[in-house]
Amino acid sequence: MSRKRNIVCSLFVMLLTMSSCSWLDVSPSNEVNEEDMFSKGDGYRNALNGLYLKLSESSFYGRNLSWGFIEVLGQQYLTDFMERTSTYYKAAGYKYDDADVKSVISGFWSTAYNGIAGCNHLIFKVSETDLSVFQEREMERNMIWGEALALRALFHFDIMRLFAPSMETDDGKKYIPYVDSYPVISTTYYTNTEILKKIESDLLQARDLVAKCDIEEHPEWMETSYRMFARGMSSELPEEVFFAYRGYRMNYYAITALLARVYLWEKEYKKAFDCAEAVVKATHNDRLLFGFVGSSELGGDVKDSESLIFTVSNETLTDDFKPFITSDSKTRFLFSGSSIFEGSQEDQRGSSSMVGNQESVQYSKKYTLAEGTDGYDMIPVIRLSEMYYIMAEYYARNANFIEAGKMLDAVRSARGIISNTSNIISLDDFIGKLLKEIRKELIGEGQLYFQYKRLNNNSFADGVKFVFDRPENEEI
């Protein structure tokens, strides 16, 4: 993974030139620095990499939007092992008015909109720059442009999921701004429907832009050995490290998978199905690009790198996670394995290689890999199982419960469950089974809470609040 670390080390170049107090201001310290930064192709590469670093900050996917705060809201962890004065204990009770909880919520907003400002800055620069600046000419320019558009869409989508109601309870009000210009003169707030259309537009354009690299010229880079580890056949490896590790980047299929997630949120179930199916069936040289590791091999690949479509990198992940599973810590992220995995002896996700034990309860081993181990820094954002769940829901909403069950069982079988197939008799029955499967499959990945919210299902906890108030200091 040392080649990827070289990429990550270069990310600080952008951040050092883009520090600012305002969440919509990315002006560098002086114009000379900006002019110098974007005079060469490396400046654009560093700027893009800086956006990924922003995405992986602890205030976003590095912790709070993956295995931390958002998992607490989804009640994945037992509050019995949380100090009563801790931010997480208060968050589990939906005490959004608490100062500590407010700070985390404010961090979501400021991190996202600062990242969005960086996206807009890069999009503005790259769209007007001569192709001669880029080593790989049009392919590289379009790839950078497309990834920046996709990241802008992702930041906005997550802020909408946090600070606006789901489409199940949408009231037509305007909750967040969609900022897509540089420099910013003023901001305009939009309805959920308007925001989703803007997200869709950005993602469709982004996918078209990255297609030349990922689909037309280098489809082999989408295979797991290249996508996650950059160690395929030496003759086909990217000469430049910048083009490696496409699984940590907004590649063509990551954008397609994100579109599937967005369409599902929008209740456009057929569009969501089509995008999810495109990912599930994606091939190169007659081989599926995405799959599941064998259930017997899962213990040696606890994150299932074969099924990862998009991840972020946090090189301090193991150290960040360790205090929350240490036996003498005052706040620990522990769960009841017997409850989540329903006592299954077949489900390898509940095996000792996947979960550790403390005081008769469990913790996830996803983020306990030693530094330097393959994938130790990976935090999954989108994985293959979610695509199967999206396809299953489409079938269920069309009363095709047999096919819906087959989609759920495709993931269950991959995890070792072969003796108990899903027998679905109604949409409500399907939703209940779906939520159970998501809880098992995506522990520590921050998706369960959003599924509850999307479905307006508040049965999992008392006093659930699905919409954050906009931070007081961020009023426009």
Regions picked out by a protein language model, each given a short descriptive name:
Residues 221-236, 242-252, 264-267, 271-384, ...:
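Hydrophobic-face positions in mid-chain alpha helices that act as interaction patches
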Residues 86-163, 185-193, 209-210, 372-379, ...:
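Conserved, well-structured interaction surfaces
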Residues 21-73, 314, 405, 458-476:
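Membrane-proximal, proline-rich intrinsically disordered regions
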Residues 1-30:
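Bacterial Sec-dependent N-terminal signal peptides
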Residues 116-119, 196, 203, 276, ...:
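Inward-facing hydrophobic residues that define packing positions of alpha-helical scaffold repeats
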